[in-house]
Amino acid sequence: MGGASKKPISTMEKRLKKEAEKQQKAEEKKKGPSKTGKEIISRAVTIDEETKKKVLDEIKKESIITPYALATKSGISISVARKILKELENQNVVKLYSKNRRLEIYIAAS
């Protein structure tokens, strides 16, 4: 009754090569660019006049407006719709009616 047989030398060499490659890839990932100085990406959104007109028309048509509704009707992302609505709230075009952690409901300012 013998135990398990030893693995061949070629199998051991292949395993060692794979481990060495994994270590190299891990080191390359660690040496990636740091997020300091000029490497930080600006997330500012600029809105063109055509999009603003679309948004204002949608707001006039609807009694209430949410970021999701605005995004689907205007063809923009929800995050951009949120930013637009916040900007319009600061300009007193819309008024925040209700808010919880997931949803913001706006109405047209009268």
Curated annotation (Swiss-Prot):
What cellular-component terms does GO give this entry? cytosolic small ribosomal subunit
Write one Gene Ontology MF term: structural constituent of ribosome
The UniProt regions of compositional bias labelled Basic and acidic residues, in chain numbering, are 12-37
Keyword annotations of the record: Ribonucleoprotein, Ribosomal protein
Decide whether keyword Metal-binding is in the record: no
- Identify the stretch(es) annotated as Disordered: 1-37
* Family that this chain belongs to: Belongs to the eukaryotic ribosomal protein eS25 family.
Under NCBIfam families, the record lists: PRK09334.1-4
Name by which UniProt lists this protein: Small ribosomal subunit protein eS25
Report the source organism.
Saccharolobus solfataricus (strain ATCC 35092 / DSM 1617 / JCM 11322 / P2)
